[in-house]
Amino acid sequence: MIKLTSLVKAAGUAAKLGPAGLEDALSGILGKGDDPNLLVGPETADDAGVYRIGEGLALVDTVDIITPLVDDPFTFGRIAAANALSDVYAMGGRPVTAMNLAFFPACTLPGQILADIMAGGLDAVREAGACLVGGHTVEDHELKYGLSVTGLISPGRIVRNSTARPGDRLILTKPLGTGIVSTAIKADMVAPGVVDEAIRWMALLNASAAGLMLECEASACTDVTGFGLLGHACEMARGAGVTLEIALDAVPLMGGVEDLVADGLVPAGCYRNRDHYTPLVSVSAGAGGRLIPLFDPQTSGGLLITLSPQFADSFLSMARDRGLFAVAVGGVLPPREHAVVIA
């Protein structure tokens, strides 16, 4: 089998621009604009855009492309598609159509690999109940694949990343560690069981967690992806004008992640996230390297959801009954000096 991860410089969402470079590039175009039908634009770094097309109906639009973070083509395609679909789920929407976006080194890889990647993507799209309607390819020296996704939503049901309220509780629906495990895969320094667990989480759609989020009237949500848990928590806090408190000991990690960090198998994107967001985070003495997984760029990560205490209890109970993963990791405070406080 061709080792896809050996063909790229960085894997998965760890290959994205760091937050500092992205903010600089976008600084001149941020702002929602004056179209009254544009309900969610780029102004709060939300997961997708939302555009009203009629009374009681709006489109949710997103795009996400990643480099290989596993070596099996079908699995890579499935994970990349799950990662792209997640943005629609995080907004409370329902995916309806998707388009392939493939950047492929046709001179060095057989075409069957691209076919297998797109088959994996189609598998996830079909599970989401959406239709694959086309796509676009580019011959490139480095392999990349993803989807543009369009969803539907009622304007009154949009769940934004900027509407957390003091007193809410904070819930996470997948453990952390995909960037660290992917770095170890690329280096051939990880046990198969650790890889298998990470793949299960990355291939899992956020559909069920998002459905439960809507049932429990979440106040805010984002999916944890390239900026890591702390980066996305900072964006939530800044957008809402609040402070998020995260209990370090409550944050779930995938199996083997702490050992991989101790071995130095940490993606460069993790350090970019740390450098950018650390000034916004208050850390108790002694946390040290324990924070590394919280800055780890996630691919197809879980939802980070805020709910009122009553609904948070219901969410956790219903998740348990339905066999869904969900952990309370903190809460929402009135604004303090820092966007995030690590307890």
From Swiss-Prot:
Encoding gene, per UniProt annotation: selD
SUPFAM superfamilies: PurM C-terminal domain-like, PurM N-terminal domain-like
EC number assigned by the record: 2.7.9.3
Catalytic residues of the enzyme: 13
This protein's name: Selenide, water dikinase
Function according to Swiss-Prot or TrEMBL: Synthesizes selenophosphate from selenide and ATP.
Group of enzyme by EC: transferase
Disulfide pairings: none
GO molecular function, one term: magnesium ion binding
InterPro entries assigned: PurM-like_C_dom, PurM-like_C_sf, PurM-like_N, PurM-like_N_sf, SelD_I, SPS/SelD
GO cellular component: cytoplasm
Residues where Mg(2+) binds: 47, 87, 223
Annotated binding of ATP, by residue: 16, 44-46, 64, 87, 135-137
Keyword Magnesium part of the UniProt annotation: yes
